[in-house]
């Protein structure tokens, strides 16, 4: 470790010549190039989130060291071992339906992008994340026609703000059976186990066979004893109600069993029930833990792409599924004759005011896999508003991921721990309370609301990889734990991103960017500065006769050492600024409150909005480790 240095470099101002400014302004909706994003690093963090959500006895080799063992007696009082699985979000309930959906999506990512995960040295970690869920499902499936689908109660759990390691709330377990059916959750669990069986098959054949056995039994249970799970399980209705019913899950489970086994009986099932169950009738603009139709339609389109004429007996029905899949994709791409997914002004798909990012991640996944299906078959997507090539579909999916990672009007990453500017007040109990290893005293149920939930301090534990609910319909985001609709991450929101990150990391940039990149301002000579600045104007608009510009400045640490203290002078700034903290001294700024160092090669992102010319930025003092 180098000795600490305190340097005052020659002052370096960042200036943009008038001609360059004009060029920048002409590049409407300009942005940094896609290659600026580290998709492999984002993939790594995404997997850390699943570690942070683990319930039960944690392994010694875990990477999330602030988490400890928890809920080690789940189910015991009711005569069943339900230790393990995942906590759903910022609370400590184990909801079976969204957990199973998350495992399905993790597994689908492996099915489609196994090679990319192997090449990126991530496959073993994804399989570990899947196995943590499937081991729990196998334990929860205690009889052919019985499945334990929830541990904990949302109402009582939400009355306390405490760490998982200190839980004092009831851990009541709930099951479905022939008298209390739940076809949605039984079907989704069957789908998860079938998808996981295919993912594990090349690496652990015995385990794959075990998962398939349970999947087949659960599908038969779901189909034979049909009924809405939230009619049988009132405690789930308030938190994860089934709006789409159970028929989509029955088709979804059968489709995954066909994908995993090739057994024609499952293809026959989705064909014979296509119309009655809505598979070829529902044209949707969302894909989620509740509504599986778009995912089902894309998955069955794959059969056509792979088998073509050999699926002759089912081709007509499969083409109807494909038509509905392409309705969804065209709606995402804004080429569906007005029947499109809504977009925010900053370019993010917007489906719901509550946890919208879960719809962004699932849509990005379907767009990504379908783009590859088309590319492999040398096909194109024919939308009402024009033909779309596979590369364009992938480009749009990338634009959504890039928005998540920071290419948005706030310049903020909505994935916690990615980049230098991300949410630091996440609606998550474990992240907001000091770790049991840092503060061994038990944290009380109620008093913790005042001390931690309502605290303005940043989270003491960084919940790396957590995809928060995201901004509102106007791209605004309030970094506040109380803002649970937007600040809470979920298993369902994170899971689809695993496969998307794997795919994008394998081809981080393409030759035809979605937007025309703004020319970078000439980089000034470092002149002793530890930072290399690149300035881009990413948006411009007129209000009350004044032209306003959104400026993004990336400051890369090029000094070869981690910077532990930084003082910047920012002159001629008239608007709001994000990514640095104002000091008491005039025009002086330092690291934001959530940041203590800038590693060698890392970037600090500064965003500001103002009318008139750009601000002038200079490094006036810094220290390195």
UniProtKB/Swiss-Prot annotation:
An example GO BP is: cellulose catabolic process
What EC number(s) does its UniProt record assign?
A: 3.2.1.4
Q: Which GO terms describe its molecular function?
A: carbohydrate binding; cellulase activity
Annotated active site: 91 (nucleophile), 427, 479, 488
Enzyme's top EC category: hydrolase
Major localization listed first in the record, in broad terms? secreted
- Gene3D superfamilies noted in UniProt: 1.50.10.10
Q: Which family does it belong to?
A: Belongs to the glycosyl hydrolase 9 (cellulase E) family.
Q: What is this protein called?
A: Endoglucanase 13
Species this protein is from: Oryza sativa subsp. japonica (Rice)
Phylogenetic placement of the source organism:
Eukaryota, Viridiplantae, Streptophyta, Embryophyta, Tracheophyta
